Amino acid sequence: MNALGRHILAEIYGCDSNILDNLELIEDIMVQSAIVTGAEIREVAFHKFNPQGVSGVVVISESHITIHTWPELGYAAVDVFTCGDDVNPWDACNYIAKMLRAQNMTATEVKRGVFEKPVKVVNY
């Protein structure tokens, strides 16, 4: 089986609540997670909720990296979806968990676009 991409769904617990509620820090961590994996950043959008929490996306040429935080619970939901073989989504997940000072992370990898035969994707 051949997959177009790998999608990591990460549950990150025991995080520093001050980091989880800081828009600038979360945005920086997410952008840096793309940089350390060698991904090409296309767009960045983040939002701070009232009274707490941050959500955001880093759109990368290889797909996306997203986060939704619950500071009151010390929890972050993170998705990292990468296409191709050049960027390892696990590197981004592990970097994010480390920077959030997480006590625990559980994650599942889903293969996306699974074909029985190899497919050729045109890159523009």
UniProtKB/Swiss-Prot annotation:
Co-factor requirement: pyruvate
EC number: 4.1.1.50
InterPro entries listed in its UniProt record: AdoMetDC_C, AdoMetDC_fam_prok, AdoMetDC_N, S-AdoMet_deCO2ase_core, S-AdoMet_deCOase_pro-enz
Pfam families per the UniProt record, alphabetical: AdoMet_dc
Record PTM: Is synthesized initially as an inactive proenzyme. Formation of the active enzyme involves a self-maturation process in which the active site pyruvoyl group is generated from an internal serine residue via an autocatalytic post-translational modification. Two non-identical subunits are generated from the proenzyme in this reaction, and the pyruvate is formed at the N-terminus of the alpha chain, which is derived from the carboxyl end of the proenzyme.
Sites bearing Pyruvic acid (Ser), chain numbering: 63
Domain of life: Bacteria
GO CC, alphabetical: cytosol
Keywords: Autocatalytic cleavage, Decarboxylase, Lyase, Polyamine biosynthesis, Pyruvate, S-adenosyl-L-methionine, Schiff base, Spermidine biosynthesis, Zymogen
Primary enzyme class: lyase
Pathway this chain belongs to: Amine and polyamine biosynthesis; S-adenosylmethioninamine biosynthesis; S-adenosylmethioninamine from S-adenosyl-L-methionine: step 1/1
UniProt cofactor note: Binds 1 pyruvoyl group covalently per subunit.
Catalytic activity: S-adenosyl-L-methionine + H(+) = S-adenosyl 3-(methylsulfanyl)propylamine + CO2
Active-site positions on this chain: 63, 68, 83
Family: Belongs to the prokaryotic AdoMetDC family. Type 1 subfamily.
Role of this protein: Catalyzes the decarboxylation of S-adenosylmethionine to S-adenosylmethioninamine (dcAdoMet), the propylamine donor required for the synthesis of the polyamines spermine and spermidine from the diamine putrescine.
Assembly description: Heterotetramer of two alpha and two beta chains arranged as a dimer of alpha/beta heterodimers.
Protein name as it appears in the record: S-adenosylmethionine decarboxylase proenzyme
Species name: Thermoanaerobacter pseudethanolicus (strain ATCC 33223 / 39E) (Clostridium thermohydrosulfuricum)
Taxonomy of the source species: Bacteria, Bacillati, Bacillota, Clostridia, Thermoanaerobacterales
